[in-house]
A protein has these predicted regions:
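Hydrophobic/aromatic side-chain positions at a characteristic register within alpha-helices
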Residues: 70, 86-87
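TPR/TPR-like (Sel1-like) alpha-helical repeat modules
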Residues: 91-107
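N-terminal signal peptide c-region/cleavage motif recognized by signal peptidases
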Residues: 13-18
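Alpha-helix C-terminal capping/termination sites
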Residues: 52, 87-88
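N-terminal alpha-helical interaction modules that lie
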Residues: 20-72, 104, 118-237
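Sec-dependent signal peptide recognition
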Residues: 2-9
Length: 237
């Protein structure tokens, strides 16, 4: 079977119009008001200063604190953590955070009441736009790296899928947002979870095709030399 473009499969692996990756080791993105790679500047609440820290021990300590609050993290702070993990060389770990953030962002977008999310300046509208921006802008970097080792990627996505089977209380994670009735949450989440099943099947069955497409698009040459280091023991997924 002929594989569809990787961008279609994962929803975020293709470059956005006007986006170029000049340095594959550094994610250069700006998603207002949550993250600006120049600085970096971070505004996602409680963990902002630690995520922006120049000190690696301070950053790692922040990741440890976030892991302890894993079930209640919102998608902007999870995306920013993925970006910073990637930039600081914890790239395998960044894959897990990225796919977790993507899942949470898509769940948010699926279950927000769009009739009540408002317009520019309203928190619901801004978050809805942010999940799309994070996914599109960050995906080419982390997927560019992650798709270079499908055998490593598959169990990470399986973990994210397993953790996503239970819908969190979104009203506590996003207290100012109006969502669809809770009676609709499970069905919305099931559709999202099934999407990962389809992605996993494709990844397992089409490794050779994916590899060839990466070579043809220059992704293999651009990302294959990147390395990854481990977080201190006990902090991985």
């Amino acid at each position: 079977m002929k594989l569809n473009p990787i961008a279609f499969l994962v929803g975020c692996a293709g470059l956005v119009v006007g986006q170029t990756i000049t340095d594959p080791a550094h994610i250069e993105v700006y998603v207002t008001p949550y993250y600006n790679s120049k600085g970096p500047a971070v505004d996602v609440g409680l963990f902002s200063s630690g995520l922006a820290a120049k000190s690696e021990p301070e950053f790692v300590a922040t990741i440890e604190k976030m892991k302890k609050s894993w079930d209640t993290l919102n998608f902007p702070e999870t995306y920013v953590a993925a970006i910073r993990l990637y930039d600081l060389g914890f790239r395998k770990e960044s894959i897990y955070w990225f796919y977790s953030a993507q899942y949470r962002g898509r769940l948010f977008a699926s279950l927000i009441d769009r009739d009540k999310m408002g317009s520019i300046g309203d928190p619901g509208f801004e978050l809805f736009q942010a999940q799309n921006a994070f996914q599109q802008l960050v995906g080419p970097y982390i997927n560019g790296y992650a798709f270079g080792d499908i055998d490593q990627l598959v169990p990470i996505i399986e973990t994210v899928q397993r953790e996503g089977k239970v819908v969190p209380d979104l009203t506590k994670i996003y207290p100012r947002i109006a969502f669809k009735p809770k009676s609709e949450w499970d069905a919305g989440n099931e559709g999202l979870n099934e999407g990962l099943t389809k992605l996993l099947v494709t990844l397992k069955n089409e490794k050779a095709s994916i590899k060839q497409q990466r070579i043809e698009r220059g992704m293999e040459a651009k990302f294959s030399k990147l390395t990854s280091k481990d977080l201190p023991k006990g902090l991985g997924p």
